[in-house]
Amino acid sequence: PDGPPHRKQSQILVPIDTPGVEILGPMYVFGNDDAPHGHMHIRFTDVRVPASNMLLGEGRGFEISQLRLGPGRIHHCMRSIGSAEKAIEMMVDRGLTREGFNKKLINLGKNMEVVSRARIEVEAMRLMVLRAAKAMDTLGNAEARIWVSAVKAMVPEKCCDIINEAIQFHGAAGISQWF
């Protein structure tokens, strides 16, 4: 379509049983397999659909994408927090079952503090994501962008920090295939 760059894309619905649509398999996002409802690798070969399958109208594809962007970012953050939660669970389990110097690993050095700080960070991330989601619900996506940007910046960084601590907590087992 003619017009400014943000009005040159359209989105269409393609039924999965349309001739030429081939599902190649599920895709993993952050190590998570969301099949059969998640992301799929799909091949389109000479697929044809009626113009009535266009969403909102010609040139409004970017608008649709923008509407999904904030919620999508929130969703990715929530999944990342789940990964951080799993890392904490693994640290606690390792700390309570592994011994060194005749003490549980959790009681050595600053290990209890590491786990406690990780818990604090997960709770803070959850509250920030909740705040961003509430802003989207009450203010709309455009006005909530500062909150969405904040969680998009904060959550991945903090989750990586927590996961790194879990790797360190496990020593060599944190990077080997034998654990």
How should these model regions be labeled?
Residues 77-84, 111-114, 118-121, 151-158:
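Amphipathic alpha-helix face/heptad-repeat signature
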Residues 66-67, 162, 170-179:
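Glycine-rich phosphate/cofactor-binding loops in nucleotide/flavin-utilizing enzymes
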